[in-house]
Amino acid sequence: MASISLSSSTVPSLNSKESSGVSAFASRSISAVKFQFPVRRVRTGDLKFPSLSSTTRCTPRRIEAKKQTFDSFEDLLVNSDKPVLVDYYATWCGPCQFMVPILNEVSETLKDKIQVVKIDTEKYPSIANKYKIEALPTFILFKDGEPCDRFEGALTAKQLIQRIEDSLKVKP
């Protein structure tokens, strides 16, 4: 059994006649309160947790991205020779981070058919507001500069590819 001791100086209500309605004598005679409760141990059995040395640590694979500059987002959409899949994300969004390797796979699989662009909604709130981005991640597929499909939430690579192909009526 474990116990916790609280002195009357730790718990202000034990010193205060107004808060407890206890007389001054009773309040002075209460010097400590003990709470007892069972403490359970967590058994790990034969589980072993190896320590990681600097040689065994995993480092994330670097993905090369083409950083392009355009006068405006609309220029990018209108001047693209392929449909553009725009991923609206935020760095603090867990599902958005989950989608990073999936988008890389989709981009590689459909590289001849679409261009993938990521827009950080924290850095570009005007673009997010224009397209009424209220959930993250949100994907909008643009064809000829106009939105042709929109979907929200995390998807598998297979689901995302199928959705894009259905929207564009293209097959790999």
UniProtKB/Swiss-Prot annotation:
Q: Which Gene3D superfamilies does the record associate with it? A: Glutaredoxin
Question: Hey, what tissues is this thing expressed in?
Answer: Expressed in roots and seeds.
Gene Ontology annotations of biological process type: positive regulation of catalytic activity
Enumerate the active-site residues. C93 (nucleophile), C96 (nucleophile)
Keyword line: Chloroplast, Disulfide bond, Electron transport, Plastid, Redox-active center, Transit peptide, Transport
Keyword Transcription regulation in the entry? The reply is no
Q: Which GO terms describe its cellular component?
A: chloroplast; chloroplast stroma
Instruction: Tell me one GO molecular function of this protein.
Output: protein-disulfide reductase activity
Residue numbers marked as site, Deprotonates C-terminal active site Cys = D87
- Tell me which InterPro entries the record gives: Thioredoxin, Thioredoxin-like_sf, Thioredoxin_CS, Thioredoxin_domain
Annotated Thioredoxin domain ranges read 63-169
Q: Which residues form the signal peptide?
A: none
Compartment list:
Plastid, Chloroplast stroma
| Major place of residence | plastid
The job of this chain, per UniProt, is described as:
Thiol-disulfide oxidoreductase that poorly activates chloroplastic malate dehydrogenase (NADP-MDH) and fructose-1,6-bisphosphatase. Provides reducing equivalents for peroxiredoxin Q.
* Assigned protein family: Belongs to the thioredoxin family. Plant Y-type subfamily.
Name this polypeptide is given: Thioredoxin Y1, chloroplastic
* Species the sequence originates in: Arabidopsis thaliana
